A protein has these predicted regions:
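Short functional hotspots at interaction and active-site rims
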Residues: 1-197
């Protein structure tokens, strides 16, 4: 399933030429950015029980804390992971770019992110370009072009498995989940998004 807007002529045109436009950039130089939500009520979505027995699991339905995970992914692995309470805004995103992302960048890296308004606040491009890296935005309605979406799937599956119930447990579980992302995983994420390796 995908967004119907991908078939609008203007969006379809941008999507059709995306991979061609990146052909000159080695995959090892591509750095994809995104954020995702996590909370203290995450639990496995399925499980097993002995034949004839019902699977029973407990999930909190009361107060829980929602947090935002932000990171980048490149062929070598996940980088610059941050976790903070609440939703992303432009000020937090710029702080992450300056303090988390930029120290991991090298000259000629190409940072790619979606068109979220918080990704376009003043100072983001300047911070990235200050180290000789470049910035591009994905075509609209194109999460399938972002390998980090597959990384989030793996990380959330790990978080559900660990089932953190406090902020401290969520922080520890997030660290564990990011450490579980291997270069082999990242290769698969890039291939799944149709990038030439």
């Amino acid at each position: 399933m995908h967004a119907a807007e991908q078939h609008r002529p203007d969006v379809a045109e941008q999507r059709a030429h995306w991979h061609e436009q990146l052909a000159a950039d080695p995959a090892a130089r591509l750095v994809f950015v995104d954020e995702s939500g996590a909370n203290t009520k995450m639990t496995r979505l399925g499980g097993r029980a002995p034949v004839g027995e019902r699977l029973v699991s407990q999930v909190p339905h009361g107060h829980y804390q929602t947090s935002t995970l932000i990171a980048a992914v490149r062929l070598a692995g996940a980088c610059a992971p941050w976790l903070f309470e609440g939703a992303m805004d432009g000020e937090l995103f710029l702080a992450w770019v300056r303090q988390g992302l930029v120290p991991t960048l090298q000259a000629d890296d190409l940072v790619i992110m979606d068109n979220l308004a918080t990704h376009k606040v003043a100072g983001v491009r300047e911070a990235i370009e200050s180290v000789g890296a470049r910035l591009r935005y994905l075509p609209p309605y194109s999460p399938d072009f972002n390998p980090i979406e597959n990384m989030w799937s793996k990380i959330k599956q790990r978080l559900r498995s660990l089932a953190p119930r406090t902020d401290e447990e969520l922080l520890e579980a997030a660290a564990d989940a990011f450490e579980s992302v291997s270069p082999a995983d990242c290769l698969g994420f890039f291939l799944h998004a149709n990038y030439d390796i």
